[in-house]
Regions:
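Short Lys/Arg-rich basic patches
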Residues: 2-6
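Short, contiguous alpha-helical
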Residues: 7-11, 15-18, 28-85, 128-177
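A short secondary-structure junction motif
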Residues: 24, 116, 120-123, 159, ...
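Glycine-rich, flexible loop/turn motifs
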Residues: 25-27, 71, 90, 121
Length: 177
Protein backbone atom coordinates (compact mmCIF):
# COMPACT_ATOMS: atom_id res chain seq x y z
CA UNK A 1 0.00 0.00 0.00
CA UNK A 2 2.83 2.42 0.83
CA UNK A 3 4.59 1.59 -2.44
CA UNK A 4 1.35 2.31 -4.31
CA UNK A 5 1.02 5.67 -2.55
CA UNK A 6 4.59 6.64 -3.43
CA UNK A 7 4.08 5.49 -7.02
CA UNK A 8 0.91 7.58 -7.35
CA UNK A 9 2.64 10.56 -5.74
CA UNK A 10 5.63 10.57 -8.07
CA UNK A 11 3.43 9.89 -11.09
CA UNK A 12 1.39 12.99 -10.18
CA UNK A 13 4.60 15.00 -9.82
CA UNK A 14 5.58 13.82 -13.29
CA UNK A 15 2.33 15.26 -14.69
CA UNK A 16 3.07 18.62 -13.05
CA UNK A 17 6.63 18.52 -14.36
CA UNK A 18 5.55 17.78 -17.93
CA UNK A 19 3.14 20.73 -17.84
CA UNK A 20 5.83 23.00 -16.44
CA UNK A 21 8.37 22.12 -19.14
CA UNK A 22 5.92 22.07 -22.03
CA UNK A 23 7.05 24.40 -24.82
CA UNK A 24 10.30 25.47 -23.17
CA UNK A 25 12.91 26.96 -25.47
CA UNK A 26 16.68 26.58 -25.25
CA UNK A 27 16.75 30.14 -23.94
CA UNK A 28 14.24 29.19 -21.21
CA UNK A 29 16.40 26.23 -20.18
CA UNK A 30 19.45 28.50 -19.71
CA UNK A 31 17.79 31.59 -18.21
CA UNK A 32 19.00 32.69 -14.77
CA UNK A 33 17.39 35.50 -12.78
CA UNK A 34 20.83 36.11 -11.24
CA UNK A 35 24.11 34.20 -11.56
CA UNK A 36 23.35 32.41 -8.27
CA UNK A 37 19.99 31.00 -9.47
CA UNK A 38 19.86 27.53 -10.99
CA UNK A 39 18.43 27.49 -14.52
CA UNK A 40 15.65 25.09 -15.52
CA UNK A 41 17.94 22.87 -17.58
CA UNK A 42 20.32 22.37 -14.68
CA UNK A 43 17.45 21.69 -12.26
CA UNK A 44 15.99 19.01 -14.56
CA UNK A 45 19.35 17.29 -14.93
CA UNK A 46 19.94 17.47 -11.17
CA UNK A 47 16.48 16.02 -10.39
CA UNK A 48 17.05 13.02 -12.61
CA UNK A 49 20.60 12.46 -11.42
CA UNK A 50 19.64 12.56 -7.74
CA UNK A 51 16.75 10.11 -8.17
CA UNK A 52 19.05 7.80 -10.14
CA UNK A 53 21.72 7.97 -7.42
CA UNK A 54 19.30 7.37 -4.56
CA UNK A 55 17.42 4.43 -6.06
CA UNK A 56 20.01 2.66 -8.16
CA UNK A 57 23.20 3.23 -6.18
CA UNK A 58 22.20 4.04 -2.60
CA UNK A 59 19.29 1.62 -2.14
CA UNK A 60 19.99 -1.17 -4.63
CA UNK A 61 23.79 -0.95 -4.78
CA UNK A 62 23.63 -1.02 -8.60
CA UNK A 63 25.46 1.10 -11.11
CA UNK A 64 23.41 4.18 -11.81
CA UNK A 65 21.44 4.26 -15.06
CA UNK A 66 23.64 7.27 -15.90
CA UNK A 67 26.63 4.92 -16.03
CA UNK A 68 24.98 1.65 -17.15
CA UNK A 69 23.38 3.23 -20.20
CA UNK A 70 26.30 5.63 -20.77
CA UNK A 71 24.23 8.81 -20.44
CA UNK A 72 27.35 10.53 -19.13
CA UNK A 73 28.85 9.93 -22.58
CA UNK A 74 25.69 11.08 -24.38
CA UNK A 75 25.89 14.40 -22.53
CA UNK A 76 29.69 14.49 -22.23
CA UNK A 77 29.45 15.03 -18.47
CA UNK A 78 31.34 13.49 -15.54
CA UNK A 79 30.36 10.03 -14.37
CA UNK A 80 29.93 10.89 -10.68
CA UNK A 81 28.46 14.38 -10.89
CA UNK A 82 24.87 15.07 -9.83
CA UNK A 83 25.05 18.77 -9.06
CA UNK A 84 25.51 18.65 -5.29
CA UNK A 85 28.09 21.22 -4.32
CA UNK A 86 28.13 23.03 -7.65
CA UNK A 87 29.36 26.59 -7.39
CA UNK A 88 27.48 29.44 -9.09
CA UNK A 89 30.20 29.41 -11.75
CA UNK A 90 29.71 25.70 -12.43
CA UNK A 91 25.95 26.19 -12.70
CA UNK A 92 26.34 29.19 -15.03
CA UNK A 93 28.79 27.26 -17.21
CA UNK A 94 26.72 24.07 -17.26
CA UNK A 95 26.08 23.04 -20.87
CA UNK A 96 22.67 23.32 -22.44
CA UNK A 97 21.50 19.73 -22.73
CA UNK A 98 19.15 18.52 -25.43
CA UNK A 99 15.75 18.54 -23.71
CA UNK A 100 14.42 15.47 -25.55
CA UNK A 101 17.51 13.45 -24.60
CA UNK A 102 17.39 14.70 -21.02
CA UNK A 103 13.74 13.67 -20.75
CA UNK A 104 14.64 10.28 -22.21
CA UNK A 105 17.22 9.82 -19.46
CA UNK A 106 14.66 11.00 -16.89
CA UNK A 107 12.14 8.46 -18.19
CA UNK A 108 14.71 5.67 -17.81
CA UNK A 109 15.40 6.78 -14.24
CA UNK A 110 11.70 6.95 -13.37
CA UNK A 111 11.07 3.52 -14.92
CA UNK A 112 13.86 2.11 -12.76
CA UNK A 113 12.36 3.73 -9.68
CA UNK A 114 8.85 2.46 -10.40
CA UNK A 115 10.12 -1.04 -11.22
CA UNK A 116 11.88 -1.13 -7.86
CA UNK A 117 8.76 0.10 -6.05
CA UNK A 118 6.56 -2.61 -7.60
CA UNK A 119 8.82 -5.28 -6.10
CA UNK A 120 9.13 -3.64 -2.69
CA UNK A 121 7.49 -5.34 0.28
CA UNK A 122 6.13 -3.11 3.07
CA UNK A 123 8.73 -4.39 5.57
CA UNK A 124 11.55 -3.43 3.21
CA UNK A 125 10.83 0.26 3.78
CA UNK A 126 12.56 -0.06 7.18
CA UNK A 127 15.74 -1.53 5.70
CA UNK A 128 18.91 0.51 6.11
CA UNK A 129 20.63 0.06 2.73
CA UNK A 130 24.02 1.53 3.71
CA UNK A 131 25.82 0.68 6.96
CA UNK A 132 27.75 3.94 6.76
CA UNK A 133 24.43 5.84 6.79
CA UNK A 134 22.59 4.01 9.62
CA UNK A 135 19.98 6.73 10.05
CA UNK A 136 18.63 6.47 6.46
CA UNK A 137 16.04 3.81 5.63
CA UNK A 138 14.49 3.02 2.27
CA UNK A 139 11.42 4.99 3.42
CA UNK A 140 13.64 7.99 4.20
CA UNK A 141 15.08 7.86 0.69
CA UNK A 142 11.62 7.90 -0.88
CA UNK A 143 10.52 10.76 1.38
CA UNK A 144 13.56 12.68 0.12
CA UNK A 145 12.85 11.83 -3.53
CA UNK A 146 9.20 12.90 -3.29
CA UNK A 147 10.12 16.14 -1.53
CA UNK A 148 12.89 17.02 -3.96
CA UNK A 149 10.82 16.21 -7.03
CA UNK A 150 7.94 18.44 -5.95
CA UNK A 151 10.29 21.18 -4.78
CA UNK A 152 12.22 21.23 -8.05
CA UNK A 153 9.08 21.00 -10.18
CA UNK A 154 7.75 24.03 -8.32
CA UNK A 155 11.03 25.86 -8.93
CA UNK A 156 10.81 25.09 -12.64
CA UNK A 157 7.22 26.35 -12.85
CA UNK A 158 8.16 29.49 -10.90
CA UNK A 159 11.16 30.22 -13.13
CA UNK A 160 9.01 29.69 -16.22
CA UNK A 161 6.56 32.20 -14.76
CA UNK A 162 9.38 34.68 -14.16
CA UNK A 163 10.47 34.32 -17.78
CA UNK A 164 7.04 34.49 -19.39
CA UNK A 165 4.83 36.23 -16.89
CA UNK A 166 1.11 35.76 -17.51
CA UNK A 167 1.89 33.69 -20.60
CA UNK A 168 3.74 30.96 -18.71
CA UNK A 169 0.81 28.57 -18.89
CA UNK A 170 -2.12 28.40 -21.32
CA UNK A 171 -5.30 30.26 -20.39
CA UNK A 172 -7.15 26.95 -20.11
CA UNK A 173 -4.54 25.49 -17.74
CA UNK A 174 -5.92 23.33 -14.97
CA UNK A 175 -4.16 21.19 -12.44
CA UNK A 176 -3.74 17.58 -13.59
CA UNK A 177 -6.42 15.20 -12.36
Amino acid sequence: MLARFITDTINKEQEFLMQAIDDLTVSDLRWQATPEVNPIGWILWHMFRVEDTWVQFFIQNNLEIWERQKWNEVFDLPLRDNGFGHTPEQVSNFPTLDLAKLLEYGAEVRTGTLDYLTELDFNEFTVIPRERRPNITVADVFRQIVGECYQHTGQIAYIKGMIRGANAFPSDYTAPN
